[in-house]
Amino acid sequence: YELSMTLAVLGVLLATGSLRLDDVVSHQASHVWNFIPQFIGFIVFTTAVFAETNRLPFDLAEAETELVAGYHVEYSSMKFAAFLMSEYMNMVTASALIVTLFFGGWSFPGMGRLSGWWLLIASVAVFVTKLAFFLWLFVWVRWSLPRFRYDQLMQLGWKGLLPLATVNLVWVGFAMAMRWL
């Protein structure tokens, strides 16, 4: 799923024309948010991020059959808490990337009329609200979906996400050639 995630990010970078995240946000502020023209890329990236963060339904390393021999058995107290905190920080980072790449980052329609401190406060509030939504989505998916088996995960990655990510990249290239994006 890392390859699919990379191809989805390449679609965003191709449409934006820059590798800088603030340029990606500026492009979305002056155009439409990337999840609309690249909805397939958004779905691929979000699914790959869920798999990358090892959250349910992709938490195969923490499945009941793996708990006896897993690495969590050897740690307790603060070391075990550090593992859990790193998983949650991974969720926050992944959610921040989703917001920045596909949902306009800290921009929101109508914020151009603000200036000074009001713009800063509104930008932080918009980003934190979008971030909180995707963190809620992580929790909701964990509560709602059952765990995948290894063969299902491999099939999803190679036969589902990778072809969709390739289609998204071809779509973005075609849309750029036709001057639609």
Regions found by a protein language model. Name each.
Residues Y1-L181:
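Selective transmembrane helix interface/packing segments
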